[in-house]
UniProtKB/Swiss-Prot annotation:
Subunit structure: Monomer.
Subcellular location: Plastid, Chloroplast
Family named by the database record: Belongs to the IF-3 family.
Pfam families per the UniProt record, alphabetical: IF3_C, IF3_N
GO BP annotations, alphabetical order: ribosome disassembly
Sorted UniProt keywords: Chloroplast, Initiation factor, Plastid, Protein biosynthesis
One Gene Ontology MF term: ribosome binding
Known function: IF-3 binds to the 30S ribosomal subunit and shifts the equilibrium between 70S ribosomes and their 50S and 30S subunits in favor of the free subunits, thus enhancing the availability of 30S subunits on which protein synthesis initiation begins.
Protein's UniProt keywords contain Chloroplast: yes
GO CC annotations, alphabetized: chloroplast; cytosol; membrane
Protein name: Translation initiation factor IF-3, chloroplastic
Gene3D superfamilies attached to this UniProt entry: Translation initiation factor 3 (IF-3), C-terminal domain, Translation initiation factor 3 (IF-3), N-terminal domain
Length: 185
């Protein structure tokens, strides 16, 4: 039980939560720990009832008339919410987008080097953005650039899938690859 302090969330959505004595409404609708409505009570009576139950009175909805408060162990509730948020962050994809740059006139050995780079990035679980740059009048040879990116896609098709097929953005052609999810069978 957290004796009437004004607790602040780190979230920008909720700047603060009112609990116990900090609830400034004359009467509130009280909801039990199990979700059962206890009815409309005077705020002081509701705080007293919460203390007798060993829980906190937390303002849930101040917009409704009368405002809705819930009886919960706020410390435990806050811990569970923070734990869920932390687990959610763990599950988020930490995949970075790695970039491999080349031109359409790339030599065979250099192409193999870029292919190996992309292969390593994909193996480590990162997305790969392949950027093909054209300088000056080279933009007239878009078909050669498309052929090169198609060749790269076929060379990496065993471990990568195309997230975005080759597209032109100004004087560059871009291809985005993501690692294939391998079934553990």
């Amino acid at each position: 039980m957290l004796g009437g302090e004004l607790l602040k969330y780190k979230s920008s959505k909720e700047s603060h939560i009112l609990i116990n004595e900090n609830i400034n409404f004359p009467c509130v609708r009280v909801v039990d720990v199990t979700g059962k409505q206890l009815g409309i009570l005077d705020t002081r009576q509701a705080v007293e009832y919460a203390k007798n139950q060993g829980v906190d009175l937390v303002l849930v909805n101040e917009i409704s008339d009368p405002p809705v408060c819930k009886l919960i162990d706020y410390g435990k509730h806050k811990f569970i919410v923070e734990k869920r948020v932390k687990e959610g962050r763990k599950k988020q994809s930490g995949a970075l987008v790695k970039e491999v740059k080349m031109t359409y006139k790339i030599n065979e050995h250099d192409y193999e080097t870029r292919l190996n780079q992309a292969f390593k990035f994909l193996k480590s679980g990162n997305k790969v953005k392949v950027t093909l740059t054209f300088k000056g009048r080279e933009i007239q040879h878009l078909s050669l650039g498309t052929m090169l990116l198609n060749r790269l896609m076929t060379d990496l098709q065993q471990i990568a899938e195309v997230k975005r097929s080759p597209y032109q953005d100004g004087k560059t052609m871009i291809l985005i690859l993501t690692p294939k999810i391998v079934d553990p069978q």
